[in-house]
Structure formats: structure tokens, C-alpha cells
Swiss-Prot record:
This is 3-dehydroquinate dehydratase. Signal peptide: none annotated. It catalyses: 3-dehydroquinate = 3-dehydroshikimate + H2O. Homodimer. InterPro entries: Aldolase_TIM, DHquinase_I, Type-I_3-dehydroquinase.
Amino acid sequence: MPIIKSSRVNIGRFTIGGSIPIVIISIFDHDAKSLTEKFETKKLSDKNLYEIRFDLFDKVNIDEELEIIRALDEMDIDYIFTYRGHDPEKIYETAITKMVPAVDMDLSLLNKVNRRSPDTRIMVSYHTDSSKDMIEKLDEMLKANADIVKVACNYKDEKNFFKDLIEIAQRKEISGKPVLFIPMGKSFLRVISAYYVSDMVYAKYDKETAMGQPDPDYYNKAFSLFNYIG
């Protein structure tokens, strides 16, 4: 699990493409200081892989970004840095210059952010409400200069989800590149995607950063069931 395997890619100590999808805990906070305190007081464990949603912080500027990166580096935290806000090129180039473990950038930014580092994995992503657009973009993304590909779609009709799942599985099997397929809105669809194609899944800490994010325990129980059935 996932059934369709990919080549292996590391984000820090975590290996994508293994036997069980990696659970990413998506987090944000007021500022660097409040985030650091959560790790220091063990509210957040240093054993997990995190998504840092910098655009959702109350304080968003280069100095705050640098302080977050410095603090997480000192505490040896593995994470994916994500920013969906104003002036993204500058924010991402700063993150890559500082060699964060991974960044998640929108497809529209891939050729605008010129900075690259062998220490930073690049995840290219595309979010939409149109499954047709998503599949078309996926073909482009699988050929792009990125380590990991993520597509996310909001579904009103579950039949469209299953149709897309087959399409994505076929493409992943051919390319061998790590793929995340995120069906937004319903948590159980995220689990089904993980069983077949998704090498990583997103969980909430205390608040969702996208529709339908369950907590980590939801995934862990589902994955245990799949292993039992297998």
C-alpha cells in the first residue's frame, strides 16, 4: 500500500515510496515563537513529517520565515514548506536558499522560482474543482522538473473520483514518480486514494488547512485495517 508503487524519494528522514503512505500533519501558528514553543513543550512531536503552511500564519514576512526555518533546523524537524500568498517567488527562493527539506509550490510557479538545491525536494501541485483540468495538468506535471507530484480536486460526485483514480493510477504506474492524489471534501476518499496511489496523505493538527482533512489517528486506524485485510 499504496498498490501502485513509485520510485523512492527522501524528505529528511522520511522515505516516500515505501510500504505505507506517509502521514503529513499540516500546521500553522501565530508566529515562529508560538510554533517553536509547541515543539519545545512536546505538543508537537519531532517524530512526524509536517507541512508548514506559512501563508496561514498571522505574521508573514521574510524575517519570520527565516526564524521558522532556523528554529526547525535547530530542532531537526522534517517538513514541507508551503506558501500560497503574496509574492510567492521571493518566499520560495528564500526557503530553497536555506535548504528546507521540501517545498510544495503551485505548477504556475515552477518555472518562475529559479532557485534549486540538492537538499530541497520539489513538490509541484495543482488544485482545482475540475477533474478534466486536473488530469490534463497531471500529464504536464509528471514530465516537469520536480521530485513529487500532487493533484487535488474537490468532488461533488464520487463517481468522478473513482474515474480519476483509475486515470491517475495508470499514469503513476508508467512514470514511477511519487504522486499524491488528494480528493478534497470527504475524508474516506483520501483513504481510498492512499490505498491505491497516494504516497503521502495530509492530516490536520487542530484545524483543517484543506477540506476533509482527518486527524492522523484516522489514517493510522485505516492503514492498520488494510494491513490486516492484506
